[in-house]
Amino acid sequence: MIVGESSRHPPTSTRYEFRRAGVFAACRRAGAEVAIFPEGEWTPVRLRGSLFRWVEVARPLLECDRLIYACCLKTHWLSKFSISLKHSVGCVRPRHRARLHFGGHFEERVAELAGAVQPSLIVVDGRQCYVRGGPCYGVVREANVLLAAGDRVAIDVQGIREIQRIPGNALRHDPWQYRQLQHAVRLGLGAANDDQIALVQAGSC
């Protein structure tokens, strides 16, 4: 088992954040390896879409047998929400991530970067979540939910709906109206409508 991460951009240090959060100690106890993506190797990956031709992805993500995402549930001032599709941005080399912010179409660019890797399972920790602001500062509330799926579009749709249950949230549109999800559907990254999603409840957290 390998636990990997890449902080958003300098001066944030992935190694520092891992140490602060106790990840190194937890991995030692579990017998897991740690991968600090910015300190490792990157592999070019071609993308489908019109906004990126290719990006570099952390090599361990392409060589592992199974890739499991561990995501947060939050709003985002630029991409509107940050769940599993936006989580994929952390898989990409920082200098390529910077291109998100040039040329407009930020939400569509997020969806295209998400096509660089294919997780087998996505787990979203929504015990607490941002309901306004984000990704780093904003209004935090308790959502008391854990989500798991193999489909990034499906889990992001449900994640948005969980945020929308909380009074004062910033997400006012039907999930399928957000451009990040619309472009992900065009790229074939997941479910295309509610009829393709089955919600199975497994108790409360």
Which role does the model predict for each range below?
Residues 1-205:
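N-terminal and secondary-structure boundary signal
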